[in-house]
Regions:
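Beta->alpha loop/short-helix hinge microenvironment recognizer with preference
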Residues: 1-363
Length: 363
């Protein structure tokens, strides 16, 4: 079902006022693309349906990675590419969160702050994985950066999927200890992660006052690890929820009041058991918050490490899968086509069934 309101609608309302928000040219470029997505401004295709024999216009998408309308097909492509990479082992979901003291630096030096987050998270897992007391094997990790909270505030954190074990020096698989109930002690991981992250920032060009470091060392850092998945089948589908997710989906926008220039959207209160609530912001404040999560140009927000890195998988993954007796795992496919404009089989309004569309021309 198509959402009633979209981020593009809100951008359309404030298009003449965007310059007053103090955004960068990179922000404006992304917002401009989102506002034009799947409109006449992007051009499109004229398709003829062999079911209803009507012509249908399919406008092109902007394909910007921050666009709420364009993420569905990218997520499906990513999931399909991961199907052949699963191992027949338990997987854990680990979340590394930055304290709010670094938020202002994330806005001004996003590449450094976010890259350091990836590095520190992987270094933390490596330290525990390499230690025979905890595992004694080379680990792997798929990490996805999210920068938002439910209210669109800045809340940088990494969602990581980690196989429950690693490769010994002899090349044999070693299962995670603790009877598979948890990966490593999260309290210990939090302390190591804090040290690793601060060390990365100190090595960077960022000049952060010592009082900021004192403040972050005086508080507990959040590292959260969920219990293992029921089976590898659920791993990629689960991570697929996070890979191409953006700050807010169009479906969360409950109301757009054009006259008063107000936006109401739904949010979950995780401190209250995920209870749903509604928030109302001015359209300008909504856009300002949305723009907080436009990543720096060229920044890679999904990264693979260790035995899940591209180089390692290409050379050694088939052998490890054979050792672990990994079977081909079928992932449930969505019925939504990868791209509405380019799809061969789609369902159009007033059509009774999924039908073949013939591309009969460009707009």
């Amino acid at each position: 079902m198509r959402p009633k309101h979209t981020v593009a609608d809100i951008l359309e309302i404030e298009q003449l006022q965007l310059k007053s928000l103090g955004l960068t040219s990179w922000h404006h470029r992304a917002l401009h693309a989102i506002r034009r997505c799947r409109t006449k401004a992007m051009g499109g295709h004229i398709d003829k349906c062999d079911c209803c024999h009507k012509l249908h216009i399919s406008y092109n998408s902007c394909r910007n990675r921050h666009c709420p309308t364009c993420q569905g097909h990218k997520r499906e492509e990513w999931i399909r590419a991961r199907e052949d990479e699963l191992l027949n082992v338990p997987y854990f979901h680990v979340v590394f969160t930055l304290p709010s003291e670094f938020n202002s630096y994330a806005l001004s030096h996003g590449k450094i702050v976010y890259s350091s987050l990836f590095k520190a998270a992987w270094q933390t897992l490596q330290q525990f994985g390499d230690n025979p007391k905890h595992l004694g094997g080379r680990m792997g990790m798929i990490a996805v950066l999210h920068t938002w909270g439910q209210n669109l505030s800045l809340h940088p954190h990494l969602h990581c999927i980690v196989p429950g074990g690693g490769l010994s020096k002899a090349g044999k698989w070693k299962k995670a200890k603790n009877h598979g109930k948890y990966l490593f002690n999260v309290k210990s991981m939090s302390q190591v992660f804090r040290s690793k992250y601060v060390a990365e920032l100190r090595k960077s060009e960022l000049k952060i006052p010592q009082k900021v470091y004192n403040a972050v060392f005086s508080k507990k850092w959040v590292v959260y690890a969920k219990q293992p998945f029921r089976s590898p089948k659920y791993v990629i589908e689960y991570l697929g929820r996070y890979t191409h997710k953006i700050a807010i989906s169009n479906h969360r926008i409950a109301n757009v009041n054009r006259k008063d220039r107000r936006v109401t959207f739904t949010a979950k209160e995780y401190r209250h058991g995920g209870r749903k609530t509604s928030l109302t912001l001015s359209t300008q404040e909504f856009i300002r918050r949305f723009a907080l999560h436009i990543l720096p140009k060229g920044f890679t927000r999904i990264r693979h490490y260790g035995i899940l890195s591209s180089t390692w998988k290409k050379e050694k993954l088939p052998k490890l899968q054979a050792e672990l007796a990994t079977k081909k795992i079928e992932i449930n496919k969505t019925k939504e086509p990868l791209c509405i404009a380019d799809a061969l089989f789609v369902k159009k309004e007033n059509c009774i069934q999924f039908s073949c569309l013939m591309d009969v021309g460009l707009l």
